[in-house]
Amino acid sequence: MKKLIVLTGAGISAESGLATFRDSGGLWEGYQVEDVATPEAWRKNQELVLEFYNQRRKAALEAKPTRGHAILAELQNYFDVIIITQNVDDLHERAGSRNVVHLHGSLFESRSTLDPTLTYKIEGWELNRGDKCERGSQLRPNIVWFGEAVPMMETAAQIAATSDIFLIVGTSLVVYPAARLIDYVPDQIKKYV
């Protein structure tokens, strides 16, 4: 079976009603990105950051996968599909996709502020102040914030390099380093944007 690697972005989930940062004139659900999606925001106001992500998680739980999500899942019948998504929702998985790499993390996981390798599933939609890891540090959303390194980038680059077909859906390729993934795809491989 040919290996189909799919890079997805916010555009595939937007039809589900989930807000996207790029389409909101610099505001993200009414917030400046600097106030809710940076390490500095976390240090300044953990309550605000937690509430922001709790609301995003709640919205994601209420959203339904789009036809685009379903089509990508159906392609598993014909290809060895790996989805590399910039999205932090779980709509690909709920549509039936089995092999999804979340480049920027997941709304449905938390991680230790002391040890980022300690990650935990979030049951329900709330992560609160006082929720701690086994080592006693506050849990934060397991999301890559602006200004942070992308831990899954090397894995994603290795996957992109193995593709027989590379498909890009719902992203304008302006968010780095994800936009650079296409550079890892061998020159002779078909790329569809």
Where in the sequence are the language-model features?
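Conserved catalytic core of sirtuin-type NAD+-dependent deacylases
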Residues: 1-193
